[in-house]
Amino acid sequence: MKTNIQICLVLLFFSTMASCSRLDMIGMISGTSPTIDERFEQSQQYNTEHGFATLHAPADNYHVYVCTDTHINGTRKRWEEFVDAYRADDVCPVAVHLGDIIDAKTDFNYVKEPLLSPSPKDTLMAVCGNHDIYFKQWKNFIAAFKTSTYYFVVKTPSGARDLFVVYDSADGTVGSKQLQWLENTLQWASKQGFRHIIGCTHTHLFKRDGSQGHTSNFTIEETYALLDLLSKYGVEMVWSGHDHVREITQVRGMKCIVVDSMKDEDKEPYYMLVTMGKYVNYEFVAVE
């Protein structure tokens, strides 16, 4: 009887994991060291030395291109299409990748190669996802993108300023140190007269379909703590990925958007095209 129960539990575990089609089990089990607090401290060291970026939009109504979960591993066709699209857009000052940039042990330099050709618009803001730290790949992520906890400001010709706050949720928690930084940053931001405040992270606040099994999801307690904090200080939207399936939830005046995945193997991949103006509008663009 005991053996049968053990077999059932093992089968249940692997059936749950199978729903994440390219989840690398070895990478997940081997750990995602360092911890979130350690990753935060390393990110803050970079931020202290280099500061936070202010970008200049070419128009008061400008575009931000947003993708997630490319899981690049050997091919990067759709990633290259995304890069070409935002670079060709005359009113796009920045693009955001919401994490799970790579899959397994892919070199981040392979991801960055399409960004190396000369272009006035090569500003990519990266979010750290769970696959980006599997196999202890944090050191490679930080070498490529420098920090996983930061903010950047986009300033328009008329002087309007939009704030984008990026926080690390790669292993399903923001940790105590980053949570305090997030509160301090949002408290400061609420007094600065920003036109819009947007949160960018990998793990979504609300998990409805269970497609990612037990990988990197917030506890209920942390979900409510983040929801209270973000809504308290006027965050208008939170953009995230991880679930591979689009989902839009409106709660406490804040819109939480899970963006579709954009893997080369996906049957219906999309990225999100956001128009930042008096209002924030968005649409989802199919990728070939």
Where are each of the predicted segments found?
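C-terminal motif of bacterial Sec signal peptides marking the signal peptidase cleavage site
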Residues: 16-19
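Binuclear metal-dependent phosphoesterase catalytic core
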Residues: 23-45, 187, 246-288
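Active-site glycine-centered loops adjacent to acidic/histidine catalytic or metal-binding residues
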Residues: 69, 99-100, 129-130, 202, ...
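Core catalytic region of metal-dependent phosphoesterases/phosphodiesterases
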Residues: 78-156
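Beta-strand-turn-beta hairpins that frame and shape the catalytic cleft
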Residues: 53-65, 151-165, 193-196, 250-256, ...
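Bacterial N-terminal signal peptides that target proteins for export
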Residues: 1-8
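His/acidic metal-ligating clusters that form di-metal
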Residues: 85-94, 123, 163, 173-256, ...
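N-terminal active-site segment of His-dependent metallophosphoesterases
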Residues: 21-110
